[in-house]
Amino acid sequence: PAICKFTGFSYPMRGKSLSFYRGKITIKMEYTKDFFEKVFSADRMKKYFLLYPGDEAKAIKHYQCNIMLSEAMYPCLSVFEVELRNSVVRELVAFAKREDWYVVFSTTPGLMELNKYISTAKKQIAARGEDITTAKITAELTWGFWTSLFNRNYERILWKDLRRAFPFVKKANRQRKVVASFLNKFRRLRNRIDHNEAICWNLDEVEMIHDEMMNVMGWMNKEVPTWLSQFDRFSSVSLDIRKIMNW
């Protein structure tokens, strides 16, 4: 193995060459199918190698592009989740007429089932030895909870208030089922990314979801998409992937 020495540290590197660039060392490594199957499991990698029989290099590139695409979605996902949560909480406070809005779930017919999310959040906070506050409960609740508020089961009770969380939505889209459809689509993509699942199989679809998410952000606040676009790298990463994969 080659020995890489840098800033007082030595460690073995199994690679083909070392090169220097602006004071940094770039290690050019050879990674094979065996490496990826060992690190990420043969089952996870199977779909990639089956897609490119006889071309391990392209299969590996595809897997790496999946990681790149997942990483590039995080700014949009994280901003959307926080914006949605805060917009919805504002309307739930108005609905409940109290800051600890979740308290009314346990006594409101039709909403009692939602109390299970609140109980779970409280248990998780208590398990960390922290004080249970409204802010911490709000932060602890999952995307699944926020999305569930737009289910058909709660339309009669909640929709007339929750629709005000989207003051800039066009009239044609000002329907619970439209909002719920988008939120569930975003949640499914987010869950796949969080569980390191494949999302880079239909790049057109992921690009569409990213655009839809930016659009729905604008339904809540017109300025958020403009602000996020200043540092969101999704479009450039997506373009890079198309070049890498020759798509």
Language model feature labels by segment:
Residues 1-181, 185, 203-247:
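Extended intrinsically disordered or low-complexity regions, especially N/C-terminal cytosolic tails and loops
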Residues 196-204:
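Inter-helical turn/loop segments and adjacent helix faces that build the functional surface
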